Amino acid sequence: MSDTEQLRQAVQAAIADNSFCTLATSSAANRPHVVGVLYAAVDGILYVSASDASIKARNIAQNPRVAVCIPVWQQHGLPPLCVQFQGTAEVCALHDPRMVALLQTGKLDAITGHGALDIPGSCLLRIAPGRRVATYGVGVPLDELMRDPLHADRSVVLS
């Protein structure tokens, strides 16, 4: 397996195996906003529960371009490993057929199991990563990361 394919698999696993990220949005007036959110990953797409009145949902409705940073792992003495990407997002109503299917199959239980969708105005955010994903430390051998942490950045095309 090539180094590129190994990195691609490591990135896909990091996205699938984690559940917290920071989500950066910007309003139509270019006012930035960043917030930590829980997510569920389904087939490489991130889903976040939100209120349609929240800043993140309002910003996405105005401007679908987002950025995401997923902290992956931290070793004492080293910066946290992470996956980051730019992508597009959309605000989805709970009755959207795509969301209904995911909810019925339980694929979004990790973000909906605590009653978040029972609140009036609840919605789901659907975040699709762009083609290229950047990383820090992901797929880098630990000895190399410790020896040369300034050169532990990588990027890969997801497909």
Please tell me what each predicted stretch does.
Residues 2-22:
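Short, basic/aromatic recognition patches
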Residues 14-15, 60, 103, 127:
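A generic structural signal for nonpolar/aromatic side chains embedded in well-ordered alpha-helices
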Residues 18-20, 36, 63-65, 121-124, ...:
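Short, surface-exposed beta-edge/turn micro-motifs
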Residues 23-27, 74, 110-118:
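Short helix-to-loop capping/linker segments positioned immediately adjacent to catalytic or ligand/cofactor-binding
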Residues 55-92:
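Helix-adjacent hinge/juxtasegments
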